[in-house]
């Protein structure tokens, strides 16, 4: 067990859950979804299999929790995004903050690795691809579309907000994400990252303003 992961003052249950998620994330990346078992997760995290099941009732649930945890580490979960959107910042400022975190998440080596794992396994196991999509991309789109809808203040339909969320993510990914997955593109850093996100924000702002009733 990685002793460096332990922190003072954490409830034992929370600490064990964190250790399980950490071990599971590593195993899913190293072994793939199909070759990772709850037994191996228990062994890697230093807890019993019963303890693993007390936190996650199935491997599917554990896998999705690992994906959601990664998104949360970049403040792209509902709680963090709601905090940004309700802090009084403008639409463009909110989209800029979300966009920069989104790009940083996509460029994270573990994120790239899990995308590659999913692509490799999807042909023989569409189930794991669906689990990943639900916990990661789809969940993020739902949160983002709700933020966009709220900024519309009743002047935009939810269906339009949903499409704008899809459009914004597409603008952020551009060709950069595909090239990153192929290993032929270096991460965007500093001014280059800010410029890339700013361009996407300018475009989605135009679409947003055009969509207002």
Stretches found by the model and what they are:
Residues 93, 104, 109, 113, ...:
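Amphipathic alpha-helical packing segments from all-alpha helical-bundle domains
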Residues 19, 27-61, 65-69:
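Helix-turn-helix
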Residues 69-91, 181-191:
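Short, flexible, glycine-rich and Lys/Arg-enriched loop motifs at helix boundaries
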